[in-house]
Each structure stands twice: as C-alpha cells, then as structure tokens.
Amino acid sequence: MKRYHVCLFLCCLSAIFISADKVEPMQQLVNDFLSADWPTVLSAKEKMENTGEDCIDDLINMMNDCRVNKLQNTGDLIFPGAEKYFGHGQIIDYDIDDICVRAGWLLEDLTFLNFGFSGIHLPDNELEGFISGNFPEYFNNPSNRTHLEELTASGERTLIRKLSIEKAKNWWNSASQGWNRLDALHEALNSQDEKCQVKALFYLRNGRTRCEGLTEKYYRTHLESIIKKLAKVKLGRVSENAKLIMLDSDFDWLSIKPVD
C-alpha cells in the first residue's frame, strides 16, 4: 500500500511538470515576441505561428497593449518604423514597433484574414478611403462620418488601429470554437478580398510554418482547382502567385513546411 501511494505521488508530480512544460514554452514565446530585438521577434513569430490556434488567445490579449517597443537590429528590414532604407530586404506592411499592431501582423499571417492593421501606415490622403473600404459599418454611420471629418491624419491612424482590434476580437469571439488553419487557408483562397487571397497564395509559395492537414493529396483534392481559377484573374498580385504555384510540379513549396 505504501508503495502504491509513492507511485501515485510520483505520477501526480510528473503530471504537474508535464503541464508546466506545456504552459511555459508559449509564455516564453510571447515574451520573445514582445522583445525589441528583431531576430528574437522573428523567431518567436515563426514558432507561435506553428502552434496554430493555440497562440490566438495570447495575440488577442496583446492587442490591449499599444505601447511602442522600437525594434533594434532590423538590418535591411523594410517597414514603417525603419530608420534606414537599403533599397532591398524583407518588406512588412505593418508598424510592428507598436505591440498591438505586431500582434495583428502575426494574427493576419496566421489566419490569412484582413482585419485592417496594415492600413495604419498608409499615406495621409488614403486613410479615409481605407476606412470606408474596410470598415463600412462604421463609415456609413452619419455621426461617425462627422467625427471622422474632424480627425487629423494621426487621429485617423489611431481610429484604424482601434477598429482593427475590435474586428479581430469580434472575429475570435465567434470563430474560436472549431477554427483551424487549413479551413482558413481554403476560405482565404475563395475570398473576395484580394489581400486575403494574396496572403494565402504567398503562404503556399513561401510559407515555412505548419498548416496541419496540408498535404499533396489535400491540395489536389481541394485547392488545385481554386489555384487554376486564380491564375486567370486580372489582379496581377493574385494571378502571378497562383501561376508560380502551378509551375511547381515537384511541390517544393510543400517540402519547406513542417510535416504533420
């Protein structure tokens, strides 16, 4: 009996440590993603993206933090907060010095959705048009229109950030049960939103993060016909990416992604 209790105690202790192991890595990834060191942030982003839906609650929580943590060691990275431009390098259309926008960047890359975070850095004369196109429910309200007309460009940027965060939170409130990245990829390719289509196509071509269930068989059965259709559209960014996927008959784009 004594031996039984000892074994039971050790099993419980082991379960506690296993549970701690599962929680601790994500918290460490979150901490790294909030870092000011760009290589650390980029590495954490990829690892968090590999966890799929498991990181989304943390990303939504990060959107409550809109402080600026200016990135360092960015090299030739091209993004709105960059202080030097080298004429080449990775391009990111998000002001990722801003923590809540950084969370939105990862969430949009993970889900292939367009919540609006990339519109914050647009030229002053494009901000109102972006609001009308991406947040029509807000824009078409007369009192909101009056308020919008009184805003400076800085105020419009703050408004876009606020509306993007609200859109992301509302989406997750309704989508959290049963969401998975594979279905999201399929939906984005079928979307009428060019940005969603391009994100999904770019992921297929160049993405190195996990999408559970994405296999050659799944592609041929569910995605290939969509890609062929997108290759014929007039939007250059969409058709060019789709054509390049079709040309990759060896499925090299699939081999660079983690295996399930």
Segments from the language model and where they lie:
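Positively charged n-region of N-terminal signal peptides that target proteins for export
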Residues: M1-Y4
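Bacterial N-terminal signal peptides
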Residues: C7-A15
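Extended repeat-based scaffolds of very large eukaryotic assembly and lipid-transport proteins
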Residues: A20-D260
